[in-house]
């Protein structure tokens, strides 16, 4: 079996909650585009924004501005609907991540059940691929979900790390192992593996140390921490934490 090549791990930052803070009072401040510029300055390599059906935080105009003016690739989080596909066709983001969406939820509560909605997802996945948009599916780290993603032809999956982050520290090793197995299976299937949801300074290192995971997407924690420490220092600290977690992998791969 060929040795796994250890790839640089990208940091994508979700800026939804910059818009949440703006919308709490109305107006234009704080501006998600300005946040995206600071993310680039701090070492982030992508910006994620979720345009929800109810437009509770990010707006259509935000998506248009981010695509037109942000120096980083835009990862457009979207429900698998005809409306969102039409917006993606108009805006042409670098990537689109399909996520489940419920009006009553505060945040995304689980991964997309690709097994159950595989047929409904197919025209959305194909439509995004037709505009050269990199498609990812936000899924729980389960073999059946990965197999369904492969059948759909999705080139990327993002593993839902929420259960790992919310589990008591004494039981977290089992959830980390579950993520590792899923990442290995994804790679064996030829699917690029990302991860995210609920990660913070305490929980990111072990996930960043999974060799097959080449991108982490982190949002709420970084936006909250930036209120106290500033955007650039917060992003830079997370970037360094990820690099430290990957360093032993790179060293081992050279030996």
Feature map (PLM): residue ranges:
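Catalytic cores of alpha/beta
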Residues: 82-91, 142-152, 195, 199-213
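Glycine-rich phosphate-binding active-site loops on the catalytic face of alpha/beta enzymes
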Residues: 97-105, 156-168, 212-231
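Hydrophobic faces of well-ordered beta-strands that scaffold small-molecule active sites
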Residues: 9-15, 47-49, 74-78, 96-98, ...
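Conserved N-terminal beta1-alpha1 strand-loop-helix module at the mouth
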Residues: 1-77, 81-93, 148-151, 174
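N-terminal active-site wall of soluble small-molecule enzyme domains
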Residues: 51-127, 145, 159-162, 179-185
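C-terminal helical cap(s) of enzyme catalytic domains, especially alpha/beta-barrels
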Residues: 67, 110, 171-172, 225-248
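Active-site mouth loops of central-metabolism enzymes
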Residues: 14-32, 73-80, 107-115, 129-141, ...
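Histidine/lysine/aspartate-rich catalytic loop segments that bind and position anionic ligands
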Residues: 134-189
């Amino acid at each position: 079996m060929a040795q796994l090549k250890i790839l640089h791990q990208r940091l994508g930052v979700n800026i939804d909650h910059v818009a949440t803070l703006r919308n709490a009072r109305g107006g234009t401040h704080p501006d998600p585009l300005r946040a995206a510029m600071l993310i680039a300055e701090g070492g982030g390599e992508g910006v994620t924004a979720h345009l929800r059906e109810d437009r509770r935080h990010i707006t259509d105009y935000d998506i248009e501005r981010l695509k037109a003016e942000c120096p980083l690739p835009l990862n457009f989080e979207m429900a698998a609907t005809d409306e969102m596909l039409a917006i993606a066709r108009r805006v042409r983001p670098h990537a689109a991540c399909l996520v489940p969406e419920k009006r009553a939820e505060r945040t995304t509560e689980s991964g997309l059940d690709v097994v159950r909605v595989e047929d409904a997802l197919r025209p959305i996945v194909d439509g995004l691929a037709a505009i050269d948009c990199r498609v990812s599916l936000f899924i729980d780290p389960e073999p059946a979900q990965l197999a369904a993603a492969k059948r759909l032809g999705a080139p990327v999956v993002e593993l839902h790390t929420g259960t790992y982050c919310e589990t008591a520290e004494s039981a977290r090793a089992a959830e980390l192992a579950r993520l590792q197995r899923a990442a290995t299976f994804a790679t064996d299937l030829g699917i690029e593996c990302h991860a995210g949801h609920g990660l913070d300074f305490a929980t990111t290192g072990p996930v960043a140390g999974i060799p097959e995971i080449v991108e982490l997407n982190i949002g709420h924690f970084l936006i909250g921490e930036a209120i106290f420490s500033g955007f650039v220092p917060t992003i830079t600290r997370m970037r360094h934490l990820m690099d430290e977690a990957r360093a032993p992998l790179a060293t081992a791969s050279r030996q």
